[in-house]
UniProtKB/Swiss-Prot annotation:
It comes from Homo sapiens (Human). Keywords: Cytoplasm, Hydrolase, Intellectual disability, Isopeptide bond, Metal-binding, Nucleus, Ubl conjugation, Zinc. A motif (HXHXDH motif) lies at residues 68-73. PANTHER family: CLEAVAGE AND POLYADENYLATION SPECIFICITY FACTOR FAMILY MEMBER, INTEGRATOR COMPLEX SUBUNIT 11. 1D-myo-inositol hexakisphosphate binds at K462. Zn(2+) 2 binds at D72, H73, D178, H414. Belongs to the metallo-beta-lactamase superfamily. RNA-metabolizing metallo-beta-lactamase-like family. INTS11 subfamily. Changing I210E: Decreased nuclear localization of BRAT1. The lineage of its organism: Eukaryota, Metazoa, Chordata, Craniata, Vertebrata. Zn(2+) 1 binds at H68, H70, H157, D178. This is Integrator complex subunit 11. Pfam families: Beta-Casp (PF10996), IntS11_C (PF21386), Lactamase_B_6 (PF16661), RMMBL (PF07521). It is an enzyme of class 3 (hydrolase).
């Protein structure tokens, strides 16, 4: 029995180091290769020993797919390919290919050059890793080999994020990565067709959350920022370089312009320029409004937002600073936080999810005394606000995507166990779909029913539609046609088209049944009695008496004959084509009951 096996190496009942191993019809695919921001030891990387105990990883894995450039999805890639050892293809979209190495190098500098961490990848390893990348376009079907194919769908979330369909023959798995089902100020909503995979592997970060109105959240965010700078405080907004950063920059830029505010807004040095460059380069990945107005005005060229210099953090007076990274686990955002945390006038606004172990997660959990490096205790007096501008789907969005794709089963990753359990029950009860939520290292095995895909000719479909017999997804029905196999592909076509394509002449096949009648009259008289009887019974059918004495009802032919062994009885031969099988069977049953008594 064919089966699909799924083992999370990371992000199983957890958020961070996303890495899922999928085996489908003898092919092995690794989905994402992320890093956990809450750890500084070997636990930051997925446990690759689950992949295979014997031989090279390249011999076992057919390919690696990266959904987007966030480090919890791609951060372990150079470690995996260059230090663990993998030489096979790595698939990702063009924007991910462009941005991924920049973020990897930024993080490497923080981890190695500033913190002095060992057993970490080098700049050269990042370059060597990226040489193995094969970039894909949206909706492009890519043949990994003769049997395995992949296809990318738009995921929203961040520039270049994609959901991937992995297909081998008639079996398929869809992996969502991170996605957003609602459009925002710079990206569109995630979209996938009704692909009906055997399994949908979906993120579940906000498995129990139904978000409030986006407009209310934006108004609340602007109000809090404005109130803080009005009283002379500083606002720190930790963000990742691309994604929510651009969303909130557009929002503040518009507000500052409208209110004619002069308080400075800063963004981490260098990242605005890089972001601007990539949004220009990959403008087709943005939403419709930005694509339309891009020629007249680039929404990412900000008038009020300037590059940040480290010395600005000590400047007196109010300011707003966007600093990376978004979870306060390292880098410039953490440095600024340490400087500003002791002043109650200041505010830190966390606009996205923070994994356990990060400073961001600790302050959102209510901790106000933090043990930093060197056992130094930092007292947090500044105001802490969490405002979800996260580009992840909420519970409603996840249910919407499951309904859209119509999978046979669902598997939840990238979420917290308790929240996953709630969503699992919701999916099973409301959508009647089996749902799984394996922990890291746990394997889920799903049996699949072998099926053969059959293409249907346009002519046959048009004929069915003209008869008002279009099949429905929920109520399947039979289509009659001729099955043709060519180059291992099956097609259902009309019999006329099949004869034409195969160069064959039509031969009519008829079925004949003998019905015995007790009648001593001549054959012609018997046939006339049969005609009169059927004419009176079958008022909605075309019943004819032909010159040769035979009777027809539609395509059914009836002929009376005297059997040689008993001239006193007659045999009625009833013959029909397979199209009129129901009518032929009905007439046979009717005539077996006998003819009405003739008047004397």
């Amino acid at each position: 029995m064919p089966e699909i096996r799924v083992t999370p190496l990371g992000a199983g009942q957890d958020v961070g180091r996303s890495c899922i191993l999928v085996s489908i019809a003898g092919k092995n695919v690794m989905l994402d290769c992320g890093m956990h921001m809450g750890f500084n030891d070997d636990r930051r990387f997925p446990d690759f020993s689950y992949i295979t105990q014997n031989g090279r990883l390249t011999d076992f894995l057919d390919c690696v797919i990266i959904s987007h450039f966030h480090l919890d999805h791609c951060g372990a890639l150079p470690y995996f390919s260059e230090m663990v050892g993998y030489d096979g293809p790595i698939y990702m979209t063009h924007p991910t290919q462009a941005i991924c190495p920049i973020l990897l190098e930024d993080y490497r500098k923080i981890a190695v050059d500033k913190k002095g961490e060992a057993n970490f990848f080098t700049s050269q390893m990042i370059k060597d890793c990226m040489k193995k990348v094969v970039a894909v376009h949206l909706h492009q079907t890519v043949q990994v080999d003769d049997e395995l194919e992949i296809k990318a769908y738009y995921a929203g979330h961040v520039l270049g994020a994609a959901m991937f369909q992995i297909k081998v023959g008639s079996e398929s798995v869809v992996y969502t990565g991170d996605y957003n089902m609602t459009p925002d100020r710079h990206l569109g909503a995630a979209w996938i067709d009704k692909c009906r995979p055997n399994l949908l592997i979906t993120e579940s970060t906000y498995a129990t959350t139904i978000r409030d109105s986006k407009r209310c959240r934006e108004r609340d965010f602007l109000k809090k920022v404005h109130e803080t700078v009005e009283r002379g405080g500083k606002v720190l907004i930790p963000v990742f370089a691309l994604g929510r950063a651009q969303e909130l920059c557009i929002l503040l830029e518009t507000f500052w312009e409208r209110m004619n505010l002069k308080v400075p807004i800063y963004f981490s040095t260098g990242l605005t320029e890089k972001a601007n460059h990539y949004y220009k380069l990959f403008i087709p990945w943005t939403n419709q409004k930005i694509r339309k107005t891009f020629v007249q005005r680039n929404m990412f060229e900000f008038k009020h937002i300037k590059a940040f210099d480290r010395a600005f953090a000590d400047n007196p007076g109010p300011m707003v600073v966007f600093a990376t990274p978004g979870m306060l686990h390292a880098g410039q955002s953490l440095q600024i936080f340490r400087k500003w945390a002791g002043n109650e006038k200041n505010m830190v606004i966390m606009p996205g999810y923070c994994v356990q172990g990060t400073v961001g997660h600790k302050i959102l959990s209510g901790q106000r005394k933090l043990e930093m490096e060197g056992r130094q205790v930092l007292e947090v007096k500044m105001q802490v606000e969490y405002m979800s501008f996260s580009a992840h789907a909420d519970a409603k969005g996840i249910m919407q995507l499951v309904g859209q794709a119509e999978p046979e089963s669902v598997l939840l990753v990238h979420g917290e166990a308790k929240k996953m359990e709630f969503l699992k029950q919701k999916i099973e009860q409301e959508l009647r779909v089996n749902c799984y939520m394996p922990a890291n290292g746990e394997t889920v095995t799903l049996p699949t029913s072998p099926s053969i895909p059959v293409g249907i000719s346009l002519g046959l479909l048009k004929r069915e539609m003209a008869q008002g017999l279009l099949p429905e997804a929920k109520k399947p029905r039979l289509l009659h046609g001729t099955l043709i196999m060519k180059d291992s592909n099956f097609r259902l076509v009309s019999s006329e088209q099949a004869l034409k394509e195969l160069g064959l002449a039509e031969h009519q096949l008829r079925f004949t049944c003998r019905v015995h009648l007790h009648d001593t009259r001549k054959e012609q008289e018997t046939a006339l009695r049969v005609y009169s009887h059927l004419k009176s019974v079958l008022k909605d059918h075309c019943v004819q008496h032909l010159p040769d004495g035979s009777v027809t009802v539609e395509s059914v032919l009836l002929q009376a004959a005297a059997p040689s062994e008993d001239p006193g009885t007659k045999v009625l031969l009833v013959s029909w084509t397979y199209q009129d099988e129901e009518l032929g069977s009905f007439l046979t049953s009717l005539l077996k009951k006998g003819l009405p008594q003739a008047p004397s």
